[in-house]
Regions:
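Solenoid-like repeat scaffolds
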Residues: 48-49, 108-114, 143-150
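TPR/TPR-like (Sel1-like) alpha-helical repeat modules
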Residues: 129-152
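N-terminal alpha-helical interaction modules that lie
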Residues: 20-100, 161-242
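Boundary/linker segments of alpha-helical solenoid repeat arrays
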Residues: 118-119, 146-160
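TPR repeat positional signature
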Residues: 79-82, 121-124, 128
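Alpha-helical solenoid repeat scaffolds, predominantly canonical TPR units
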Residues: 99, 106-107, 140-143
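Bacterial Sec-dependent N-terminal signal peptides
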Residues: 1-23
Length: 242
């Protein structure tokens, strides 16, 4: 197994292009048009099959998920708890076949609730690599990079007025962790934006701003949300491909 099990280092090249702020109206129109290349059922099918996807396709897939009936960001994901339990006991360097099979099954089940979780994608890259399935390992690595790139291109994250857009709270901290940066507890800046400070400044940047507004689109009136900030990337570094 060629995985180097250290703190995750991002595999994607940071692009300097201007921010691609999600246009909700346009995305909604495109993903509901059966004649559009961004028709959502087709995009999701290709994603689940591990097909290569363009940046625009990832953009519509990720932000379009907020319009799907299955998007329930405030519900508990019990399968994620199972993933955590397996990762806590597994021998990372020499996992058993049984543990890897269980991890893959739990990871796929957890993705039914959160199909674009960088943490889950990263774990599945590791699991498929450990199982010897190089095709799926590469497919999930591509998906991981595509989702991280999609988030990064949605805003520079340096100001409250130019946040990166996320559809799950954990995706923001996962994004920071993917850069091998530690972070502290997030600070709510407004009804739509949160600031997540780094453990210490990097190049004068103290942290990133994230727009989490989609999370509360369908929030029940009596709902009180409690977030956990401890789950990251399990110190896994996916395989690099050249």
């Amino acid at each position: 197994m060629k995985h180097i099990l250290t703190i995750l280092t991002a595999l994607f090249v940071v692009l300097s292009a201007s921010a691609k702020t999600p246009n909700n109206d346009l995305i909604f129109a495109n993903i509901n048009d059966a004649n559009s290349p961004f028709y959502y059922p087709n995009l999701m099918l290709r994603y689940k099959e591990g097909k290569p996807m363009s940046e625009d396709e990832y953009h519509h897939l990720y932000y379009g998920y907020a319009f799907q009936p299955s998007y329930k960001p405030l519900e508990v994901n019990p399968s994620m708890n199972r993933v955590q339990e397996i990762m806590a006991r597994i021998s990372i360097d020499k996992p058993s076949v049984h543990d890897i099979d269980e991890l893959i099954a739990a990871g796929i089940a957890a993705m039914e609730h959160d199909p674009f979780s960088p943490t889950l994608l990263n774990i599945l890259v590791y699991a498929y690599g450990a199982s010897g399935d190089k095709v799926r390992e590469l497919a999930y690595s591509d998906h991981l990079n595509g989702i991280l790139r999609c988030i990064e291109q949605s805003g520079d994250g340096l100001k409250e007025k130019s946040p990166m857009h996320i559809i799950m709270f954990s995706h923001g901290t996962d994004f920071i962790a993917s850069k091998s940066i530690g972070y502290r507890k997030g600070q709510i800046m407004s009804r739509t934006v949160e600031f997540v400070p780094f453990d210490y400044p990097r190049n004068k940047v103290k942290g990133y701003y994230f727009d989490y507004s989609r999370v509360y689109w369908n929030k029940p009136d009596n709902y009180t949300f409690k977030r956990e900030r401890t789950w990251q990337f399990n110190n896994l570094k996916p395989q690099e491909y050249k």
